[in-house]
Swiss-Prot record:
UniProt protein name: DNA repair protein RecO
Transmembrane segments: none
Gene3D superfamilies assigned to the protein according to its UniProt record, in alphabetical order: Nucleic acid-binding proteins (2.40.50.140), Recombination protein O, C-terminal domain (1.20.1440.120)
Keywords annotated in UniProt: DNA damage, DNA recombination, DNA repair
Family that this chain belongs to: Belongs to the RecO family.
UniProt GO BP: DNA recombination; double-strand break repair
Keyword flag DNA repair: yes
GO cellular component terms, semicolon-separated: bacterial nucleoid
Domain of life, source organism: Bacteria
One Pfam family per UniProt: RecO_C
HAMAP family: RecO
Function recorded in the entry: Involved in DNA repair and RecF pathway recombination.
């Protein structure tokens, strides 16, 4: 029996001569893996619907005693290919896919992450990737339950004033008195923006100038949290760090 769901294509891998192994983040069932038979040959059933980060309606069938779903067809609802995909945007799109794929377990629906992902994909336009990336990482850390207290020192418990610091070996922010050597400062501006992002939709921040340097410290702090919990380095972060 065919099921259907909205979904975001995360990754595709060649499988045999004409098939594709596809990882999808579905709204109904969370992350699933399936086989698109003859996807390299059949333009009618799949066309460009299996490009990473495409928003689709997928039709699929779970088969008894088989781990992989059979993908029947996909209808494109929105495609990242509808706008220019320059190198920074390609990396940003890849980062969204990598974090979702690495962080979320299989077969656990998460509507909050699904809605966040669609909102971020809609704002990841050429020349304006840093604001939606900041918003995405911030909310993914929060929705995963990893976000520490941003108002108090994790060591002494005192309220943080105008200076706060983070360190790879400390799970949270610390005050100036308790910071370790080689700590990085999280500025007052970045903490204030994080607070605003928790209280306002992504669209409220669109259109304002957002150079790479803005909230770079916040993104570094969030990536540090993600990588600690994933126990691995995020490949796309290394590549984003190399952008001019």
């Amino acid at each position: 029996m065919l099921k259907q769901s909205e979904a975001i294509v995360l990754r595709t891998y060649p499988m045999r001569e004409a098939d594709l192994l596809v990882t999808l983040f579905t709204r109904a069932e969370g992350k699933i893996k399936g086989v698109a038979k003859a996807a390299k040959k059949s333009r009618r059933r799949f066309g460009g619907a299996l490009e990473p980060l495409t928003h689709v309606r997928v039709y699929y069938e779970d088969r008894e005693r088989q781990e992989l779903t059979r993908l029947d067809s996909c209808d494109v609802l929105a495609s990242p290919m509808s706008a220019e995909v320059d190198y920074p945007r390609a990396l940003a799109l890849g980062h969204v896919a990598e974090v979702i794929d690495d962080l979320l377990p299989d077969r656990e629906p998460n509507d909050a992450v699904f809605r966040l992902s669609l909102a971020v994909l809609g704002q990841l336009v050429p020349g304006a990737v840093w604001m939606p990336l900041t918003y995405f990482d911030l909310w993914m850390v929060r929705l995963a339950g990893f976000l520490p207290d941003l108002m108090h020192c994790v060591v002494c418990g005192e309220e943080l004033d105008d200076r706060a610091f983070f360190h790879p070996l400390v799970d949270g922010l610390v005050c100036a008195n308790d910071k370790r050597l080689a700590s990085t400062e999280l500025t007052v501006e970045s903490r204030a923006i994080a607070d605003l992002m928790f209280r306002a939709p992504l669209e409220n921040f669109a259109g304002a100038p957002w150079p790479r340097q803005r909230c770079a410290d916040l993104r570094r702090f969030l990536v540090q949290i993600l990588e600690r919990h994933l126990e691995k380095k995020l490949v796309t972060v290394t590549m984003l760090d190399k952008l001019d």
